[in-house]
Amino acid sequence: MLSIDEQQRVLILSTLWKIAMNQPEDPEFPSLGIFKCMVSLLHKSTNDKSWVLDGQNIYIPYYAAHIVGSYTMNSLDFAEKAVESGVIPPLLDLLRGKISWVEQRVAVRALGHLASYDSTFETLAVHEEEVVKLTMGLASRCSELVYNEFVSVKDTNLRVNYHKNLITRGFGGLEMENRKAEEWASQIQCWSLHLLNCFAVRGRSIDLICNQDFLKDLSSMWGGLVNHTSPSGIGLIRILCYTQSGRRKVSESKEVIECICNLSRSSDAWQYMGIDCLLLLLHDMDTRYKVLEVASFYLLDLIELRKLGERSKVGQKITKALLIDFKNGKSRIKIPEIDRILKQIWVTKVDKKRRERSMSDEKLEEKRVMVNLIKQQANNSFWLGDIETAVEKYTEGLKLCPLKLRKERIVLYSNRAQCYLLVNDPDSAVSDTTRALSISKPANSHAKSLWRRSQAYYMKGMAKESLMDCLMFINAFVTVDKRKQEKIPYYAVQMIRKLMDSTWFFASAKSKLSNESNSSSNGNSSNEEFTKDEMSGLYTILEEPMIRKHKEAVKRKLNKYGKQKDSFMALSI
């Protein structure tokens, strides 16, 4: 292969690359010694700079490493042959960054596949400390690396030519290049985390991975919309929480715990992983009291969650974890607020449930009528602009409403959340909408609550959580009755447009580069995620109220709360 013309060599490799991608389990080329051939090409690429920079040879290391990764993806036999052929040393050279981030991407992919099998993992584990450190660094800085070296270069003619050709396969302009670069950067991060998972799941390098700075980075790693099938950072955090030393390190990081708690109250597909992490930490008596103060505040809203995906009795498991030592006199809780929350959980899940078991159908129907009357009173107060009275009435209705009347309670919680939004109390709005979504069947399916929680999260500056709820709202909105062919609401489109910019994979890297540039020019920088104009521009989305006759009265009354004349009435009560 090394003796033929470089253009022919690249043509042959690109053909082998396609075959390996489309037929990764075909034994023909692995049996003919393709791995030894790839090893010789990789060694030449990493050790002979003048050779790799000669003409088309620059494409060789990418194709060679990609071919190794494709053939070892699903086959233990091929993985063992690759290791015996000596693929690990040259792949490590690529992982070290000897060439560029493009080659690091395919190197970490191939090493991740080799680490997936027990027999080949041991050979890689000889370099354990270096591999783990390199991979942690790559996972943390890949967004900055790709942004600074590729995406931030606005003139496509100034970008590295072979990077552009590999990323877009020769098609598309600046927009396509940026979109594919985001996808590749996200893959680098996800594949790096997969490689770290292979060590962590075997109980290896836990203390090394649990570096506090890396844990903070890990908690913010999100596969995003381009890699929605990857659990990303939370997947590795959950694996760490299955080990005693991992739980101890995780519990010591306030930022990580808050991130896990936020995930547990979101409509993210990985919500259950956040809940799992908190339950593991609460069941360990060495970490329980380090996280209970924060976790109880969030988990209180999830105690009635019945089913989440394939997981059943989720709320019951949460309740048991929170009340482990509440009534046996062994609790070490000294903080009044935590004690209040646990008492509230006990009253809701134990006392009230026990009392309602013997409630007759006639009594239940009587309660339903009374609750509906109170709800109507609250609605009238709301439309008259008396938000404080409306909150009091919704609260009264919730206290009276039996747990069995789930639909009524969903409406009461969601309507009270709307009131909290109007008085600028997003924390209470998130709490109430989460409770409504926990009661809904299936979980996280009540459209109005999704929209209201999306707004509340936006007000708190939590773009990712807001985006997830907004997307779920649109999904619920358009699937309610497909025959009606409802159009997606404009206000939801406006919300998503803003949130997509804030949750862009390179948003942090762009902000950091911009701040460094501003700092060097005038010494001023800003870390605010949202500007005041953005906040007010989105918060004041005007929606058409359902009850028009009170529209002007509502506008007049809402001015008391500092709202503009056209304050929105989001998904009206």
What spans do the regions from the language model cover?
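Alpha-helical tetratricopeptide repeat
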Residues: 1-573
